[in-house]
């Protein structure tokens, strides 16, 4: 069956917005770029790179038999007086059967091509890894566990454990013949905080500190693209992007605090752990199409189940209680509370009257018994009891380690 390319506008998803980091170089047409960052020659007219090890970048997602490909030279220029000026070449890695030299078999001699393979790789096979679309995916950091290129080349260091939407700014550094191993990069992942909301807020803050900031024009584009593809930029309220919060119909998630703070509210990032991905929504939902006068309406019904055994079950229930049909309300810990009295000032029943407590229905005590209990309290116990009546409830919720997966945010 013959197939042809469609022309004109498509209904493809909007490009992913990258919050920080260097803009990936585009090699050839869109969607034909290397998955990895470039090797950069230190001088003009440097010879092709030679590697201490196999020369294949580390990629744990591939089997050993698929670890082969080629490095391709890319001439670079920069504008100068009287025209463009040559700068040292860049070399990009592609798997065999992909990229600009996709039609070449492994080992075919050609100027500007260096073939590499890991020990045990099947160089007769062709990769199905494809190439990268720079508008949707960032470059993957280069790592060589068995030895990198010779001293004529360098590459920008990018942390290997960065999140996709939180790229750190690449700091240019001279590359030694052996780069940090993957085990070392795993070790840097172990310092996670226990509080899920605090972790979520920290991720957002780090994204804003590292790399380039979102421009006003980019933020406006994020907030006003097609409704189903919108995301809330930093500094925007929820209702600026998705309209006013409602009750008992679409748009009913979010209380007043969440609406005002937008993505700064850690509960947003926490609940995103339960929101289906695009693929899960499409293939795991009950999809109901309906033709209306204004167009085709698609309804997606999806259920996420949080087990009662989940350590974060109570926390998710609490957020839902606060935010579902939450318009016009605020969390209790966000409301102003009476200030605690300092411990240095002794509090007594006469100087610091405590609010009257409701008597328990199950235990009925006579007034005489109550008087005897009061007399039995020491002065320190009286002071502590009075103080506790005015203490604020703790605002920090211990979410635990298991609430947040390594790649969920």
From Swiss-Prot:
Disulfide bonds: 320-323
Region Disordered, annotated ranges: 1-32, 44-63, 120-145, 164-193, 327-409
Residues in CoV N NTD domain copies: 31-156
Modified residues (Phosphoserine): 190, 379
Any matching Pfam family: CoV_nucleocap
Compositionally biased tracts (Polar residues): 341-355
PTM section of the record: ADP-ribosylated. The ADP-ribosylation is retained in the virion during infection. Phosphorylated on serine and threonine residues.
Subcellular location, record wording: Virion; Host endoplasmic reticulum-Golgi intermediate compartment; Host Golgi apparatus
Stretches for region Dimerization: 226-333
Keywords noted in UniProt: ADP-ribosylation, Disulfide bond, Host Golgi apparatus, Phosphoprotein, Ribonucleoprotein, RNA-binding, Transcription, Transcription regulation, Viral nucleoprotein, Virion
Domain CoV N CTD: 215-331
GO cellular component: host cell endoplasmic reticulum-Golgi intermediate compartment; host cell Golgi apparatus; ribonucleoprotein complex; viral nucleocapsid
Bias type Basic and acidic residues, positions: 180-192, 368-384
Main location: virion
Protein origin, superkingdom: Viruses
CDD domains: CoV_N-CTD, CoV_N-NTD
GO MF annotation terms: RNA binding
Oligomer status and interactors: Homooligomer. Both monomeric and oligomeric forms interact with RNA. Interacts with protein M. Interacts with NSP3; this interaction serves to tether the genome to the newly translated replicase-transcriptase complex at a very early stage of infection.
HAMAP family reported in the protein's UniProt record: GAMMA_CORONA_NCAP
Role summary: Packages the positive strand viral genome RNA into a helical ribonucleocapsid (RNP) and plays a fundamental role during virion assembly through its interactions with the viral genome and membrane protein M. Plays an important role in enhancing the efficiency of subgenomic viral RNA transcription as well as viral replication.
Family, per entry: Belongs to the gammacoronavirus nucleocapsid protein family.
The protein's name in its UniProt record: Nucleoprotein
Organism in which the protein naturally occurs: Avian infectious bronchitis virus (strain D1466) (IBV)
Gene assigned in the entry: N
